[in-house]
Amino acid sequence: MALLSPRVPRLPLASASAAGAGLRCCVSGGRAGSAAWCHASAAGSVASSSSELEAIRWGTAKLQGARDEMEDEVVLRPGSLLDGFSFAAVFDGHAGFSAVEFLRDELYKECAAALDGGAVLSTKNLDAITDSIQRAFATVDANLSTWLEQMDKEDESGATATAMFLRNDVLVVSHIGDSCLQVVSRGGRPQAVTNFHRPYGNKKASLEEVKRIRAAGGWIVDGRICGEISVSRAFGDIRFKTRKNEMLVKGVKEGRWTEKFISRINFKGDLIVSSPDVSLVELGPDVEFVLLATDGLWDYIKSSEAVALVRDQLRQHGDVQVACEALGQIALDRRSQDNISIVIADLGRTNWKELPAQRPNLFLELTQAVATVGAVSLGIYISSLLALQ
């Protein structure tokens, strides 16, 4: 199948090797067969002295997958526009592309202004950074809601977002929704920097989302807020924010619930919020690369597998872009039904040719693939049981 350009051979996944060290993390906040769009870029040049910071090499990929439309987007601004920080973000749209289209241009600008051109990032003060980014996200969401209401009364699109500000020594991540970021040490062990904001599952983050939604007057059916949407933090989605009452009336007309049912509903807040979790990771010398992707990847590939694949690809040829495309190919081969967006930032510290070859464990790969799909279904089932209590 002509899924990627250039064509990437299908490679067996390799099991992850022993863990390394080198990072410290702080957290704040609460068809197959479709065309693919891929991009690559590099920031700077390789340092001539070991005391200098090496280059960050970037690879990005967007794959439409089985969806009729492409609602994902990748934004990459490498270089030193923000006091030496590069910016990268993935947006996962739903119910249309309007929200993503707005965010593609506006989120970076608002964050850059709130962060004082990157000066706040350089302080490494997590409280100050969190406050700035949360204000920026709130402003963007308010502006987006106004824009959606003025543009089309029927436009109820939304989008999740994971954005990172990366310098060779530090990483700042801001996140809402169900995209995910991984930070990897030289040993190849992934550390998740973000949590999924979903109204189902038995993890602490999911249970907190369920509690917040119920406190706001919402309910969850089959892992979906009001039986409609399976993500609990996002930009846009005005029917769960400024148009909640209109949503109730529309639901009665469509036969999804009754007048008696909505008479008992008392909304006390937004059911979907845009407040991001913000994390700061100081990057030690053993951190190899950063991997950022939408859930079209993570629902079908475990983080340990993704890390192992990227490391093996870079060991073979050192091409970040080809590694990015190969990772997307694996998700498509596993019948991912969603759009997929991927960003990889190689910090340029690793001599990939010196890494020993990793031996594939085909049995482990098969069982992990089955477990990944099963875990999603199990999480929805557990949340449905909790909703009935």
Swiss-Prot record:
Catalytic activity: O-phospho-L-seryl-[protein] + H2O = L-seryl-[protein] + phosphate; O-phospho-L-threonyl-[protein] + H2O = L-threonyl-[protein] + phosphate
UniProt-listed Pfam families: PP2C (PF00481)
Transferase as UniProt keyword: no
Compartment annotation: Membrane
PPM-type phosphatase domain mapped to chain residues: 57-347
Keyword match GTP-binding: no
Entry keyword set: Hydrolase, Magnesium, Manganese, Membrane, Metal-binding, Protein phosphatase, Transmembrane, Transmembrane helix
Similarity remark: Belongs to the PP2C family.
Name of the protein in question: Probable protein phosphatase 2C 5
UniProt organism field: Oryza sativa subsp. japonica
